[in-house]
A protein has these predicted regions:
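Periplasmic/extracellular electron-transfer cofactor-ligation site
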Residues: 20-53, 78-84, 106-113
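Sec-dependent signal peptide recognition
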Residues: 2-10
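C-terminal motif of bacterial Sec signal peptides marking the signal peptidase cleavage site
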Residues: 13-16
Length: 113
């Protein structure tokens, strides 16, 4: 029950913050204002988010090869298969989704630990 409540609260927070100030189309800005709430400002979530929600560490070298722009874009648009990550299509513009996907997929993103 606690996990469900935590998922609901985090999901609501993400959606509430899902439109970056000024409608930014900069991938880093979108990540900082939307994704960082769960994944952390550098893509490395805190231990609580990992333990309680299974939030992925986007800087994990084992995960990085799977984080193509197309994969990240699909995750952002449709959410995760287990529904812990909410779908943000409609909350973010198409341009914002593509920008954040390119940002996360960029080789420069991983060293941001």
């Amino acid at each position: 029950m606690h996990r469900l409540l935590l998922v609901a609260v985090v999901g609501a927070a993400v959606i509430a913050c899902s439109k970056p100030a000024g409608g930014s189309t900069d991938g880093a800005a979108v990540f900082g204002s939307v994704c960082a709430a769960c994944h952390g400002p550098t893509g490395k979530p805190d231990a609580t988010m990992v333990a309680r929600l299974g939030v992925k560490d986007l800087t994990d070298p084992a995960l990085r090869p799977t984080l193509t722009a197309a994969h990240v874009e699909a995750q952002v648009r449709h959410g995760s298969a287990n529904k812990l990550m909410p779908a943000l299509e409609g909350a973010l513009t198409d341009v914002q989704i593509k920008a954040v996907a390119a940002h996360v997929a960029s080789p420069a993103f991983a060293p941001m630990r």
